A protein has these predicted regions:
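Short strand-edge motifs at loop-to-beta-strand transitions and within beta-strands
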Residues: 81-83, 124-128, 240-248, 672-675, ...
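Extended carbohydrate-recognition surfaces in non-catalytic/accessory domains of CAZymes
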Residues: 19-96, 118, 152-170, 180, ...
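Extended acidic/polar, glycine-enriched regions
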Residues: 132-137, 206-292
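Carbohydrate-binding surfaces of carbohydrate-active enzymes
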Residues: 207, 212-214, 519-787, 792-802, ...
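An acidic-aromatic loop/edge-strand motif
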Residues: 28, 54, 63, 67-69, ...
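Accessory beta-strand-rich segments of carbohydrate-active enzymes
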Residues: 28-34, 76-183, 212-213, 228, ...
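Substrate-binding/catalytic cleft of secreted carbohydrate-active enzymes
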Residues: 341-533, 563, 567, 572-574, ...
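Active-site-adjacent substrate/metal-binding segments within catalytic domains
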Residues: 60-84, 91-97, 102-107, 114-117, ...
Length: 816
């Protein structure tokens, strides 16, 4: 908890000392129009989220089939949010709404500030000067309307069912900004640094001032940050808005790096106008660019160094109930896995918490609009063949307004490395020209026309690809495929299908009566796609085809874990092995909006999947990996400094007897994979890889269950969703092993416990799953285990840290 508290404190920034203030209005009441029943709520919030918190739907609305059966008619009528506040005398007052879902009638003390027909649009930021209406005691009322079927609303697409209320509510902070005469409305910092010489940097500032009074005002704009201070005399005419451009030089700047490349150094800048309003922003000094490789793939370059982007896709909670604490835990899990990027397809977040944390922790972010606006069955607007649904007015103007407002909102975040103006398609030429006019005025980062492999007549090729798969593929696919989603280029979204949660979470989301035999809730908690990825059948076939007949619920879950671990790990490892030809990989998804069986590295309850730990092993800074295509052992290193290492290779046969032992010293350099050996062909078994540094300390491990022959994919019939499998890799020898005897011991440690597993038997013990169980029987969420899903050779001992207290620790073995 101390880590979370420290991170949240970082978000507070530097407080402004002058009397003017910016108060966030968080305490509201909410009621359905025509009803006298009122609910106390904390804004930002959706109507459905507030009702969920109030117990309106019951505790289990998201479990089983209950969400499918829920009554949505209560959202047909408007809902009214009301708050009261005091406004200080002698000040000008501005109300700022950062997101409304989807439109609203806004009144202050009975005075209409805006009507629903002028406030449609979830990503518009709106300010209202309310000085003439605000007094000592004020009543603010916001009457929100649900998004119509045809709209540019939040993009939930097919990862989960649509929210019951279509994300209806006050979705961003509402702020009361009180200032004497002049408001410092916006401050933007563009850092300019030569990546070949970090001795100094230019700080190009754009400062927007608004004179809220009806008379001219003269004063001094003051700015302060580490290493710089300045004063600028300014005269503003009555009601004038002025944009100032000012540049300062910082000597010997602290440079912002992603976590794997260095330290994410941050600065704070405070800008004030006399004794009037002040504004603080946080920024980082770094250089970000992108280029197309000789093969036409998008390559991002941070501070002069090419980056292999290793990311996953973010979504908000279906009720938008994320808190600073839950977001902090999730970003910590991203860091724990070794991922260096989060892709936001949709401008997620009720506020900037997730982006602030990415800045602090050195996690890159890719921002862009949702493919929901590119398919008529999601957007509700007519679909054009090439460009989706944003066609003509008022939709193009609304999209440009979205782009403008969100660029301004997010452009000070150093973690943000680029904008994707579309996802599955690209904007039409008229719309993209309007986007670029705004972008070139406000931004400097790489602009990319699409997350898909398209070429714009205006901005050129995207350099990206989006060719799947989204269903299960064998781990060898990532090495063997050279046409679709394999390890080449920049794959903006892909995933080997079901990432099944641990059994405790599965039972929570399905209900015991649905678990076995499999009931319809299994398919309902896959994805909401109408075409594929909506059934558990592919995973059942893969589990049986790979490991053998299913013995029941727990046996299926464990075999599905093993499939997830191997293929998700191999996806990242293959891109590392092919670094240079491979420039980026984004797992679809990082998390889930609701209790799901698909597309996640940790589940809705915050508990890691098997794939989580597969990714954690895949992304050790320097690691030994198995190339499924060539059977080679490869040392990979994306960004770590040059160093000497010692590699140990142990290969045991399918009968758990030693076959091969190899030792090798080598030097690892960034972006230079090293082949260290090769396994014999057509020989199944267990592979243990251990990497030690010059001092003999273990710095990385990897363990594989190797088939004699990889899964055989039907390359001729590959499709956008995936590829048929002609025959599965046979790992049935794992299931035929006698059950191993594993002794578990615990010892207290700071903040948790040390857990030691010892395999006392003469056979391999495959994927032991450690559990930290709370008093209510649920698993502790978050990055609790240093490692998990642990396999042990005969006689092997492993000790791992459990970062949880007051829990029951247990271990699930293979063959439950």
């Amino acid at each position: 908890m101390r880590i979370l508290s420290a991170l949240l404190c970082l978000l507070l920034g530097v407080a402004c000392s002058p009397a003017p203030s910016s108060d966030t209005l968080t305490r509201w009441s909410m009621r359905q129009e025509g009803s006298s029943r009122s609910y106390p709520v904390q804004v930002p919030v959706t109507v459905a989220g507030a009702l969920y918190e109030a117990g309106y739907f019951g505790d289990d609305i998201l479990e089983g089939l209950r969400f499918k059966e829920a009554d949505k008619s209560i959202f047909d009528t408007p809902w009214i949010f009301t708050t009261r506040f005091a406004a200080r005398e002698g000040m000008h007052h501005v109300l700022r709404f950062e997101s409304l879902g989807y439109s609203a009638d806004i009144t202050l003390n009975g005075n209409l500030l805006a009507s629903a027909d002028t406030t449609a649009g979830v990503f518009c930021v709106r300010e209202f000067d309310v000085s003439q209406f605000a007094g000592k005691d004020n009543t603010l009322e916001v009457r929100v309307h649900r998004a119509p079927d045809a709209s540019l609303n939040h993009g939930w697409v097919d990862c989960n069912p649509r929210p019951l209320d279509e994300t209806m509510g006050i979705l961003g902070p509402v702020r009361l900004i009180s200032t004497p005469d002049v408001q410092v409305q916006d401050v933007f910092v563009k850092p300019v640094v030569n990546p070949k010489d970090f001795s100094s940097a230019r700080i190009e500032m754009v400062i927007k001032l608004v004179n809220r009074s009806q008379t001219p005002v003269t004063g001094i704009v003051k700015g302060e940050a580490e290493g710089i201070s300045f004063e600028l005399p300014v005269r503003l005419e009555a009601s004038e808005t002025r944009v100032l451009n000012h540049t300062e030089t910082v000597e010997h700047p602290r440079i912002w790096w992603s976590a794997e490349m260095g330290s994410p150094q941050l600065y704070h800048l405070k800008v004030s106008f006399g004794d009037s309003h002040c504004k603080s922003v946080r920024f980082g000094i770094r250089d970000i660019r992108s280029e197309l490789t000789a093969d036409g793939h998008r390559q991002f370059i941070l501070n002069g160094k090419p980056v292999l982007v290793k990311g996953a896709g973010w979504t908000d909670d279906i009720f938008m109930r994320d808190t600073p604490q839950s977001i902090s835990r999730q970003v910590q899990m991203v860091r724990d896995m070794g991922l260096n990027c989060i892709r936001f397809e949709n401008v997620w977040g009720k506020d900037d918490t997730v982006y602030d944390l990415c800045d602090s922790l050195g996690i890159l972010t890719l921002m862009g609009f949702s493919c929901q606006w590119e398919w008529d069955h999601y957007c509700g607007l007519p679909q054009t063949p090439s460009h989706g649904c944003i066609e003509g007015e008022p939709w193009e103007s609304l999209a440009v307004r979205y782009f403008h407002d969100q660029l301004i909102r997010l452009r000070n975040h150093p973690s943000l490395i680029g904008w994707l103006s579309a996802s599955d398609r690209d904007p039409n030429e008229r719309l993209e020209a309007a986007y670029l006019e705004v972008y070139n005025q406000l931004e400097y980062r790489p602009y990319i026309c699409s997350a898909n492999a398209v070429t714009s007549r205006i901005s050129g090729p995207s350099g990206m690809k989006m060719a799947g798969p989204y269903e299960y593929v064998g781990p060898g696919y990532w090495y063997e495929d050279t046409r679709s989603g394999g390890a080449f280029g920049f794959n903006t979204e892909t995933n080997p299908g079901m990432n099944i949660p641990q059994k405790e979470s599965v039972l929570r989301m399905l209900g015991g009566e649905q678990a076995w035999p499999m009931g319809p809730a299994w398919d309902y908690h896959c994805t909401a796609s109408a075409t594929n990825m909506n059934s558990v059948k592919p995973e059942v076939a893969a589990a049986e085809g790979t490991y053998g007949p299913l013995r029941g619920f727990e046996d299926f879950v464990q075999k599905a874990h093993a499939l997830d671990y191997d293929s998700t790990r191999a996806m990242y490892e293959a891109f590392r092995v092919n670094i240079g030809r491979a420039t980026g990989i984004v797992n679809w998804m990082l998390n889930s909006a609701w209790p799901s069986l698909y597309w996640q590295l940790y589940d809705w309850y915050g508990v890691p999947t098997a794939g989580y730990y597969g990714v954690k092993h895949a992304l050790e800074p320097v690691q030994l990996v198995y190339n499924y295509a060539t059977r080679e052992i490869v040392a990979v290193n994306d960004a770590a400094p040059q160093a000497a290492f010692h590699a140990q290779l142990l290969f045991y046969g399918a009968d758990s007897r030693p076959v091969l032992c190899r030792q090798k010293d080598f030097v690892s350099r960034a972006r230079e994979p090293v082949v260290l050996g090769k396994l014999p062909r057509n020989t199944p078994g267990f592979l243990s890889l251990v990497l030690r540094d010059e001092n003999g300390e273990v710095v990385a491990r990897n363990f594989y269950c190797i088939p004699a022959v990889n899964a055989q994919h039907d390359w001729a019939n590959a499709d956008w969703w995936g590829i048929p499998i002609l025959s599965y890799a046979s790992l049935s020898f794992v299931d035929n092993l006698p059950r191993a005897d594993v002794k578990i011991e615990t010892a207290p440690a700071e903040g948790g416990a040390l857990v030691t597993l010892t395999n006392t038997s003469g056979v391999v013990s495959f994927q032991n799953i450690l559990k930290a169980v709370q008093a209510d029987g649920t698993l502790v969420p978050g990055p609790v285990w240093e490692d998990n899903f642990i396999s042990l050779l005969p006689g092997e001992t492993r000790t791992v840290l459990c970062r949880a207290q007051d829990v029951s620790i247990s271990c699930d073995a293979w063959k439950p």
